UniProtKB/Swiss-Prot annotation:
It catalyses: alpha-D-glucose 6-phosphate = beta-D-fructose 6-phosphate. The gene is pgi. It comes from Sphingopyxis alaskensis (strain DSM 13593 / LMG 18877 / RB2256). One of its GO terms (molecular function) is monosaccharide binding. It is found in: Cytoplasm. This is Glucose-6-phosphate isomerase. Keywords: Cytoplasm, Gluconeogenesis, Glycolysis, Isomerase. Disulfide bonds: none annotated. Belongs to the GPI family.
Amino acid sequence: MTIASDAWQALADWQPQKLTDLVAADPDARLQALVRNVADIRFDFAKTHLDAAAIAILANLAEAQDFGGRRKTLFSGGIANPTENRAAEHSAERGDGAPESVHAAQALHQRMRMMIDAIEAGAFGEIRHLLHIGIGGSALGPDLLVDALGRHSDRYDVAVVSNVDGAALDEAFAKFSPEHTLVAVASKTFTTTETLLNANSALQWLDEAGVADPVGRFIALTANPGRAMEWGIDETRILPFSETVGGRYSLWSSIGFPAALALGWDAFADLLEGAAEMDRHFRLADGADNICLLAAFADQVYANRLGCQTRAVFAYDERLRLLPAYLQQLEMESNGKSVTLDGAPLAQHSAPVTWGGVGTDAQHAVFQLLHQGTHLVPVEFIVAREPDHLLDDAHHETLVANCIAQGAALMAGRASDDRARAYPGDRPSTTILLDQVSPRSLGALIAFYEHRVFANAVLLGVNPFDQFGVELGKEMAKGLAEGTVDFDPATQALMKAALGD
């Protein structure tokens, strides 16, 4: 057996204690061991089943899987994505990486600032709206940033359109006036079918509205400027980012342009600085002192010792309502793998299903299952100390009290002679407490999740930076639409029923 397989066996043999016993045994020591403050964010793992024995086992696993070496490769611009023979340099966009990559990112950010200056100076006419067209990582990040941080900004109206369903574009067209709209097409390859179809429809919308030089209203955010120029966008209106920045890690690059335009450059710079602070922590902290690695330890306990197939994230803050959807792609597209780095079948469970919602709404929808269902679901709560409104304090006090009470109730449960009213308890939760939802704190929070994903990938021995699993369905959709592939009778019958002959 290898050292890694020994560690996995030790985890299988490890016996978890009841949460209430763990917390009651030595509360001060537990808080010291499982609560961290990084970048003005409090990460509280005290209500998880982690104990000293589990942490020691998983620390041995991290060493066996060369966590230190893979982390160094990540930050030095080495081949962190071996299946595509690429680096993974999203941290360089925040100033932490190979010097040449950091300099390239700084040059890109300067071009972004110049583009914003040009828009504000009227180079594209009187622009009031930005229609951002992308999908996946080219849309989820910008949408999250603008929705979370743009509540008090009146700079520009931004609509992020990702779905190829024409209703999505129709909705944006209804809100915007063509003569005052700029269109950003975001695609790493500039070959994404849905994005280009939406871009062509937006071009037609501008043309039919009588906009002079409609293609001149387009800018491109891409790692393939040649394809963007072939589509018709002038080189001066292309903001190119590096191929070594993965789509779901790209909001720090020109993909984040909608946020920089809508919020202002200072806010975008604060976002980068918050992420950079988390980068420094992840790069320098070792073992369980590293909050991203500690979080991965908890993830592996639940996925590969206690058999949890899902993980729920609930943001008790309306501004973070899009965060669960963002994390779904980040976590499941990164670590939803079944093959290790050396091509062997993965013996452990990979990423669980990530899902969630916003509190307190979710309490009236899904918490029944969390408290009394037969599935054990680790829950993550995210809440801020400071509200973003001027309403009565009772609003925020009630919100925070509900968030904290849910974690306590999941852990403690409640006995009852009436089984229908009994709560089994011993259900784990993590609480992430922000001082406030700001560009800096959101940058740090997103970077925490990125590095947590990477730490989990190291423990599992998988590559978190490829996504070959998304290709087959797209290829088959193309063949089905074009009629160039023979499909099974059931699929042919369904296609005929949906679209006719």
